[in-house]
């Protein structure tokens, strides 16, 4: 019989598998814009590593021996680092979706874009520092993970980056379709709700599950948008071919008609009229 932890780990692993499949689809696809494809690929790969690491952290928590000691520490480190890296890649993906067609950006927008990248980088640096200072978490003698008093900083840093992205998404929402807008918003709203819940409840990876759901939504909407773009391009190509064919037929038809009238003028003026 499965207990709650087994179901929890299974959900994380299935989320990782889907993220890997999505990454493979992005890698094999040649129909996406190159930069958009790259950002989506990085997001899905990072999400897969995040979910796998989280599953290992839960599976081996309290495990004895050197392998359990190493796996618990490495996997927890990767969970925190990947969370900030996903924010970095999401920020890049968001900026591409919002601005790749609009051209120039004002100074305030440029500042927010740079601040978004910087926030994610600061988050990674703080995670590295925490490995030597127990800033975010520590492990007891039985190899169990525990939060440190400053754990909330690990939530506030990515939330700051998310709020920056939220201002960009809301301000420039007209630059993207409704579906893409909702998918981008989901990455901010779902983890934010999970983070608030996580402050009062510990025992399940609510934030990472929320991130995986938003990754699914972004992948699905990106594929749907690409299908629509391909259908539009195919329709435009068909219309162009028809137009070219008609442009070739019309002069030929006109020449034949005038030639027939010319000959009828000599034979039957009434019929020619």
List each language-model region with its residue ranges.
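Hydrophobic transmembrane alpha-helical segments in integral membrane proteins
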Residues: 1-21, 151
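Hydrophobic alpha-helical transmembrane segments of multi-pass membrane proteins
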Residues: 12-31, 36-69, 75-93, 116-131, ...
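Alpha-helical transmembrane segments in multipass membrane proteins, preferentially the mid-helix core
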Residues: 21-27, 89-93, 155-175
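Short aromatic-rich membrane-water interface segments that cap or initiate transmembrane helices
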Residues: 2-6, 70-82, 143-155
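Interfacial "cap-and-anchor" motif at the non-cytosolic start of specific transmembrane alpha-helices
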Residues: 168-233
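Membrane-proximal helix-loop-helix units in multi-pass membrane proteins
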Residues: 89-92, 96-160
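Membrane-interface helix-boundary motifs at transmembrane edges
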Residues: 27-41, 66, 95-112, 169-180
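Two-component histidine phosphotransfer core
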Residues: 207-273
């Amino acid at each position: 019989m499965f207990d709650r932890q087994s179901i929890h780990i299974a959900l994380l692993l299935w989320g990782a598998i889907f993220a890997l499949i999505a990454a493979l689809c992005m890698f094999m696809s040649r129909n996406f814009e190159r930069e958009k494809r790259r950002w989506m690929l990085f997001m899905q790969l990072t999400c897969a590593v995040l979910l796998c690491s989280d599953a290992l952290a839960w599976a081996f928590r309290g495990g004895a021996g050197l392998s359990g000691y190493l796996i618990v520490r490495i996997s927890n480190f990767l969970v925190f680092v990947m969370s900030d890296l996903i924010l970095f890649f999401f920020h890049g993906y968001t900026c591409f979706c919002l601005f790749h067609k609009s051209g120039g950006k004002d100074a305030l927008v440029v500042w927010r874009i740079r601040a978004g990248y910087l926030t994610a980088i600061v988050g990674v640096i703080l995670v590295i520092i925490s490995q030597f200072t127990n800033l975010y978490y520590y492990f007891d003698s039985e190899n169990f993970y525990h939060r440190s008093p400053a754990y909330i900083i690990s939530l506030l840093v990515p939330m700051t980056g998310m709020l920056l992205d939220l201002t960009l998404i809301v301000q420039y929402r007209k630059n993207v379709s409704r579906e893409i807008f909702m998918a981008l918003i989901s990455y901010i709203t779902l983890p934010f709700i999970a983070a608030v819940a996580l402050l009062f409840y510990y025992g399940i990876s609510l934030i990472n599950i929320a991130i995986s759901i938003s990754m699914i939504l972004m992948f699905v909407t990106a594929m749907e948008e690409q299908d629509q773009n391909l259908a539009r391009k195919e329709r435009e190509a068909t219309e162009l071919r028809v137009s070219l064919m008609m442009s070739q037929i019309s002069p030929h038809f006109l020449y034949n008609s005038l030639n027939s009238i010319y000959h009828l003028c000599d034979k039957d003026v009434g019929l020619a009229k």
